[in-house]
Amino acid sequence: MTINLKVKQEKRKGLSINDIQDGYFILRNDDVWIVKMDVTNRNKIHLIDLETFHVKTVSTKNDLKSLFEDWSRIKILSPKQVNLNIGFQWKE
């Protein structure tokens, strides 16, 4: 499976943890997570790892902050800033 994520445009200031919304991306080095806000509890955040498709759930943005210890290496991107292509190859 091929995952290709290209950043189209980065904001000068960058986004902070308080800007995170449903559909945003969190990047750390080569690791990428998609943010999915819980529909029943808006404080609960699901992170989908694009490498493994594992889902990690945190209760609040503060828990999210502690999950990624070094926020200086983290980029938060909105869906408008990203071009994401996922390709599957079927083998018989």
Curated annotation (Swiss-Prot):
Name-wise, this protein is SPbeta prophage-derived uncharacterized protein YopY
User: Which species does this protein come from?
Assistant: Bacillus subtilis (strain 168)
